[in-house]
């Protein structure tokens, strides 16, 4: 008996063998791919965690609360006490630039009942760290996620390496909130631009976030307007009532909160924007000082190097992937392009450049680097992380076609090296002295002047010159009076109230430039005002000094305050250096009808009629200016000078 195998059986056996080998090969090739996918995800998550941890440690090592941060807390104290969002009781002045920041700090202060300084420190650090997370999530989506590539931190390293970025990650100011909002907007805009199907609820959430821009900070309105313009002009998703109704709904959702607050602000405060904008006259131009401010950040850290390196890396990566940013010139094509990642990148880069030009135009600021941090963050967003795509065969399979990966690797190494250099660089070495540029390292300045490594609590600032003397002089004079700083650090000039003294005293008024440390070390019943006008409308509406220090280029003479506070206006009770004639002229100047209208807009009880009057006249109030010299103000207003010049 013989055994034989038919030809058909042989063919079937060969097919089964081939199929088995193919499946085995697929399984073997899938294992490295799965391992690489796991590695890629782990690399990205690890990069996010490492960035956040490094930033948190760096910021915590430089933790502090700035004097301007304490200004915010004075408003929060008044909110918690039921006095409203004001700096001084019975005077409606919006002394904080960021409305959202004020109410965010107030909410967590009310929720936790913790000490205000610790609340604002924790909230500021938290939103600063969240900004890094949102930035990296958005950029990861921009570059296609972790599939088949490694996403390595790049632009975020540049940001956190800068000492000013770590300084203002705490500080009590809104810097962290601004970049957190920008980072979240970036992430959601990228998601919107890449979505296969845009859902209406998520779209409305996006436009609501963008609409909050003017409440985050007035300059952020530019970013919000550009983002909303893109969304409004881009093709609409399917909506039951049609695209026109959806666009109307978008306008409503984006505008409901800022428009409602704007109406309330104009009626309540009598101004269309925060009083700080009036005090700093943000409409004025100081291009030369602005260029100094820009170089004060770019120069010492050689910041242009990582910006140039990452720009090259980003462009090379985009070109290697065949990305195009130039739409076809037709209305339909442009509208379609508006909902694309390249359009979102164009928007954030354009916003960063425009805001940089604006910061230069207004002269920058007196705080080293602070007013350029948002712009830098915007410019770094598209390269917050950069992708490294390895060849299928691993490192040994590199060919000339993989030149873009080599460029990115070189950029990462260069950025890492620069970050180590910048992180340990001290840009301003003048300590407690203010240079001719007027720019200071604010944290170092207060650390040295208070003798505290981490000035956080209000009482930490009692060791700042004049502060402890102020507290002692208020306690020693229960009848009240006007406190004016003297050249000495150990006492203040006190102008007493006129007789008879009312029961409980006439109240104290402190007139000093540093509003935060003064106001947080005295009761809310003590009126604290400043010659710059951040919390004092009369000073805010004075003319800007042509060659004054940036951010401090208004200074109202104390003669006006003697009159305004109702204190004794003759010697020997007034400080010796004050002129009785000037005080009398200031009294006459303050009788100007326009000035009186301005003052009562914030001091009259808030009735419905007062609200309507303020709402109608808010724009004219914002434009109104006085001359700080009483004699010249009398002439400007057309009043009769009590001390006319003799005829020549």
Where do the language-model regions lie?
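Intrinsic-disorder-linked linear interaction elements in eukaryotic regulatory proteins
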Residues: 1-3
